[in-house]
Amino acid sequence: MHKPLIISVVGAGGKTTHIHRLAEKYLKQGKKVLVITTTHMYLEKDTILELENDMETSVGRMKDALAQGFCMAGSPCEEERKMGPLSDHVTEQILPAADVVLVEADGAKPVSYTHLRAHET
């Protein structure tokens, strides 16, 4: 099975901008780029949202977008203009279709860094 390069971007600010710069770099190299999140991320115009009641259609749409080179995907989120993480089921199906996966991977909010608390080790 094909395993993509996975890059997780973390920090208090600039994650989305950095992800877009990385995406441009890899797209210029002819790579198929998937952008996802583990938390919440701004819902951009061409984002494909996972349909809870029709995951196979969602995966098909994501694979079609990746065949064209780029896919930003997430799940519907209660916060307006945000997307959430994909389900594990959809993630497992879509990752092999990408060459590079860029992940917005934390929710630092207004703090400059995050760290594990004692109960998280």
Name each model-derived stretch:
Residues G14-K15, T39-L43, E78:
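Short active-site-proximal "capping" loops at secondary-structure junctions
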Residues E24-M72:
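N-terminal phosphate/diphosphate-binding loop that engages ATP/GTP or pyrophosphate donors
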Residues E78-S112:
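Phosphate-binding/switch loop-helix module in NTP-utilizing enzymes
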Residues T114-T121:
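Conserved small/polar residues in nucleotide/adenosyl-binding loops
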